[in-house]
Regions:
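Active-site core segments that coordinate phosphate-bearing ligands/cofactors
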Residues: 1-37, 51-229
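Core alpha/beta catalytic barrel or barrel-like domain that forms the active/cofactor pocket
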Residues: 45-51
């Protein structure tokens, strides 16, 4: 924002991720903590995501090709922007984002105070968000492919693995998979948690193991949803 407009800003949603430097109750920088860490005037100005913060400067226009004077809004971090793109706008709307990790955003009309989840003001003044996430998802399928399906190549590698997994029955013939291969985020908040395949025996094959990964991620998602309930 500074390079585009000459104004230092960040939105409330992003700032909440550096709580307690950001006071979520006051929706402002924390006077008490920042006095001992950084001068408040050195922190970016807090704005709401949809606020117009300025216009493209002549310098920025020359460097980017964007028209001088173009209006610039605050913007926000990737996950929140993705939530907006799929229609998560008002109270009760929720996004489940599948990627290298899992991320969940639920828009609420009040602060949901639960230490098992994350909280941030939502993108628009007067709204709030409750969030959760798994530390691994797509990273697990890549790990599995790289270690157990190296002979599969090409753009359809993961389609072929998924087709194999479909041949395994629900429950993966008794395999229970814990997806804690990079610790875990919500709701257990344990960086030391470890991933595990439970119940393996000589009757199992690659399809069963791969299906159990899908099911483990699904159970992890359900673990978060149970907290919301």
């Amino acid at each position: 924002n500074f390079k585009l407009t000459g104004r230092y800003t960040t939105d409330h949603f992003s700032a909440a991720f550096v709580s307690p430097l950001y006071d979520i109750n006051k929706q402002n920088w924390s006077d008490e903590l920042n006095d001992n860490i950084v001068d408040l005037e050195k922190l970016p100005e807090l704005v709401w995501t949809d606020e117009i913060i300025g216009n493209i400067t002549k310098t920025a226009s020359n460097e980017t090709g964007l028209a001088e004077g173009t209006i610039v809004t605050s913007g926000t971090i990737d996950a929140a922007a993705e939530a907006i793109s799929v229609g998560v706008i008002g109270t009760g709307d929720m996004m489940m984002m599948y990627g290298s990790t899992m991320f969940y955003i639920l828009v609420t009309d009040k602060v949901l105070s639960d230490k098992r989840l994350w909280y941030s003001p939502w993108l628009f003044k007067g709204e709030h968000s409750s969030m959760g996430g798994l530390a691994t998802s797509g990273t697990l399928t890549h790990w599995f492919k790289n270690n157990f399906a190296q002979e599969l190549t090409g753009d359809d590698t993961f389609i072929r693995l998924a087709q194999e997994a479909e041949k395994s029955p629900p429950g993966s013939k008794g395999i229970v998979f814990l997806p804690y291969f990079s610790g875990e985020r919500t709701p257990i908040h344990d960086t030391n948690a470890k991933g595990t395949f439970f119940g393996l025996d000589l009757t199992h094959n690659r399809a069963d193991m791969y299906r159990s990964i899908f099911e483990g991620i699904a159970y992890g998602t359900n673990h978060v949803i149970d907290v919301y309930k």
